[in-house]
Amino acid sequence: MPESSVRPRRIVVGVSGASGAALGLECLKCLRQAGAESALVVTRGGEITIEQELGMTLDEFACYADVVYDNKNIGAAIASGTYPVDGMIVAPCSMKTLAGIASGYSENLLLRATDVQMKEQRRLVLMVRETPFSAIHVDNMARLARVPGVMLMPPMLTFYNGPVTLDEAVHHIAAKALEAVGVSCANYKRWS
């Protein structure tokens, strides 16, 4: 029996320094609720954003993950294509991180883990956070959009699902990202 059928889905969540740390947190919460295994890697900018936007320490945030990797640990399991992972979500994905991914510049674990997802042609969802976009941002996104398995998913608000609170909007966006890596999330309202 293939290994993927005997273990829960394993998803890497990366958090970089763009605004939107709540997206990463909601992904972790939904993964836990779905019975999937989560691995977390956070950049220094992501840690600052978590503290500023959520009022949480990195340790408090990391409690929602099954495994936590230090972003400096370039030799971690998720840095190897032989380690079985079903997909990765970078939520949020800063333009700096996007540029590193687009150029194959794997200077830290988050960037290396994304590089592994691409070389193994696994699903990689990038929740890019910036507005407005510059021509350089768009060029980097266009470059990545052509890579098999990569999905660019700016966290755009949807209104067809009738969100009343910001938490509901964040949940919907996180659930959409999780669906893209094969994890069903409770209370995800699809268009019907």
Predicted regions span which residues?
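A cross-family phosphate/adenosyl-ligand binding-site feature
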Residues: 1-125, 130-192
